[in-house]
Every structure is written in C-alpha cells, then in structure tokens.
From Swiss-Prot:
Cellular compartments per GO CC: plasma membrane
Entry annotated with the keyword Protein transport: no
Primary location: membrane
Assigned protein family: Belongs to the NqrDE/RnfAE family.
Membrane topology reported for the UniProt record: Multi-pass membrane protein
NCBIfam families, per the entry: PRK12405.1, rnfE
Free-text function comment from the UniProt entry: Part of a membrane-bound complex that couples electron transfer with translocation of ions across the membrane. Required to maintain the reduced state of SoxR.
UniProt-listed Enzyme Commission number(s): 7.-.-.-
Name used for this protein in its record: Ion-translocating oxidoreductase complex subunit E
UniProt organism field: Escherichia coli O139:H28 (strain E24377A / ETEC)
Ranges annotated as spanning the membrane: 18-38, 39-59, 63-83, 86-106, 125-145, 182-202
Record-linked Pfam families: Rnf-Nqr (PF02508)
Amino acid sequence: MSEIKDVIVQGLWKNNSALVQLLGLCPLLAVTSTATNALGLGLATTLVLTLTNLTISTLRHWTPAEIRIPIYVMIIASVVSAVQMLINAYAFGLYQSLGIFIPLIVTNCIVVGRAEAFAAKKGPALSALDGFSIGMGATCAMFVLGSLREIIGNGTLFDGADALLGSWAKVLRVEIFHTDSPFLLAMLPPGAFIGLGLMLAGKYLIDERMKKRRTEAAAERALPNGETGNV
C-alpha cells in the first residue's frame, strides 16, 4: 500500500512532469490557451501513458535490451494513433483544435521517460498506475494553466467544452466577466510562459511551507514532555 501511495504522490505532486521535471513544455505552452484544450490534451496524454506503461511492462521480459527504445517508440506510436482516431471520431472539434499536438505525443519525453525509467522495471499493475498518476499530474498542470489563461484573456471558463464532452457541455461555459476584445498577452505564448512561472513559484512556496511545518512538528515531538522549546 505504501508503494502505491508513493507512486500516486510522486506522479501528482512531488515528481510532477510539468512543474518539477519540466518535460513536455511544447504542448503545455502551446495548447493551454483554454481550459477545454488543456483538459483534452491532458486526458489524451494520460490514456497514452497508462496504456503504453501497461503494454511495455507486460512485454518487458521479452524485449531485447539492445533494441528496447525502438520497440518502445513503436508501441507508443501505435497507442497514440489509436487515441488520435478516437478523438477524430468522437470529438472532432477538439481534434481540429489540438491539431499536430496529438501525434506529437509520440515524441513526448514524459511517455518515453516513464517507459524506460519505470515500466521496463516494474509489474504491469504498478506501471499502469504510474502512467495514470504521471498523466493526471500533467493534466492538472495543463488545466490550471489553461483556466488561468482563458479567464484572464477571454473572461470565460470552459468555452468550447461541447467540443470535448458533447453538446450537453455547453451549459458548463461560464462568463466571469465581459470583454469586447481578448487580452492577447494571456492568450499568446508569452502569457503561457508567465503563467507557468507563477505556477512554479506557487508550488515552490507550498513545498517550502509544508517542509517548515514538518520540521516544526518533528522538533516538537523530539522535545521532552513539558518543554515548549521557547527560551
């Protein structure tokens, strides 16, 4: 149970692929102009990570070490092609919005890195969980960045959600404030870099505060009964 918890915590927070490893920044910065696009690409990446980790882990004993990387790439490319066809069939609007960034999941360092670092060494169930956790960590980072950029740039949230979830999702659109023209700095790549920088700073501050609390709690437990540590 502790190993499962560690895999989940590492993927979602401690070893977050976007905020700690800083991998996959090209799609992270390019696609997160809206929350819907960010969520769509994040979920697609999560599905690819889960399936490729599961497949590579299952075949790890029959994969020659000398040619393992080309085999990993072929497996990843096959899964990405299947996911791309699914999005094309059931979410065509999202497919058009994401464009080239769906097939580019094949070259995403996150996917290849988890295959080599984790799936090739662990069992199928734990590898699938690792892929899901890493993918959801990246999805959360994309979604937060996409939401911030959409709110600041357009004053809306979940605009175009029907392209991802169907016609019923039109009711999810929220207009936070009205604007006649978008704030282009937030919608263009410079806004993505600024937003990512703020998220990195926020995560650092949260980690430092949590570390300080753990240190204070450990110091209090180490004191003899009746002492407060104050001079």
